[in-house]
Amino acid sequence: MTQSRLHAAQNALAKLHEHRGNTFYPHFHLAPPAGWMNDPNGLIWFNDRYHAFYQHHPMSEHWGPMHWGHATSDDMIHWQHEPIALAPGDDNDKDGCFSGSAVDDNGVLSLIYTGHVWLDGAGNDDAIREVQCLATSRDGIHFEKQGVILTPPEGIMHFRDPKVWREADTWWMVVGAKDPGNTGQILLYRGSSLREWTFDRVLAHADAGESYMWECPDFFSLGDQHYLMFSPQGMNAEGYSYRNRFQSGVIPGMWSPGRLFAQSGHFTELDNGHDFYAPQSFLAKDGRRIVIGWMDMWESPMPSKRQGWAGCMTLARELSESNGKLLQRPVHEAESLRQQHQSVSPRTISNKYVLQENAQAVEIQLQWALKNSDAEHYGLQLGTGMRLYIDNQSERLVLWRYYPHENLDGYRSIPLPQRDTLALRIFIDTSSVEVFINDGEAVMSSRIYPQPEERELSLYASHGVAVLQHGALWLLG
């Protein structure tokens, strides 16, 4: 029965792929062959390949019964699609194989995922059953379901997105949950095997009324600290912060097995753009801590649906720590995308300076002299619908998009650093922009939807001059 469901899903995906439109389909970001994609799942290095699984609906460009899509890569940049790994339909995952993680259990690729069942009609979140399940594979492609390995505590329905790792000769698992008082929390379990688990403690929880669910947890050490990474739902916007439908971020602290997680800071968003959710981390083959997120947002219009697909992932980002601050940089493998190079000489800009007439897939590096630039606004623009600019009056870096025909507009912004220069590394794809600020001190990621004739890339300044100290551009392929 499982194989017939996988076969039906693969056939449906193939039919959808035949009619997929490519106006917004990315050149160098992982996206589904067709259909729907959301959370990254099961990121792992296994059998000399990187594996990225993801939440996938192969029958439609809309969210639906969740399958696990699958892609592999040699370098985390160039991805090859593989057969669908998991399809829902068993008693414990009848309505969805929800998010989870992957581990190498003595040469067996093991997927730990949430089995989801609607108890009172699809979409009624007040009546669900969620359990943690296991599926295994020796070749990394074909998986056998092993059934339920963990059920929720009494009184908890929302219980999902297991992240598993091994430490101190013990398996550990964090699971996102909503407690009976409608407050988000992360539960910690320990296991002698992937099939036998014991509750350890509530690792962290929201304050009353702060958020009603904590999804997609991850827990890892980096530098001198541990980081709890998760996606809270129900946070209220505060000024420039928490403006998206849902957030994703980290809480730093200290932890060792058997002890409390001693938090040393507050929740901080990982990405300050419009579109970033459900990040998951893993270790590269050389031990680097890498994170990939879903570069979309719930309840966003997603114009690519008209062309038979929706959703894509961010570039793989290397995490590091400096002076207690978490940094995110594109993995160095991203440089393999570079093709034609174009230098951008230092200059003073007072109007518009065109870099590319038709920028499809580019990387741009810019270093602005903040102290010597007096323009009210200055920065980079793509067509008339996307601007990344310094606002001298508010002293903020602003990522603005304006696609009224797609019902998409608005901006996200962060404070300018208290220094003389601002260094930006920007990746523009067919329908996305990712901005790495000051060597990874901050990141802003957003989906953009310019029409083919709206891809002129230029620098600009208004009401004054802007001083560019350094610039470079590469066409990517």
Locate predicted features:
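Beta-rich carbohydrate-recognition and catalytic domains
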Residues: 1-161, 166-211, 221-272, 293-344, ...
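Beta-rich accessory regions
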Residues: 10-16, 249-477
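Repeated scaffold domains used in trafficking and secretory/extracellular systems
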Residues: 215-217, 279
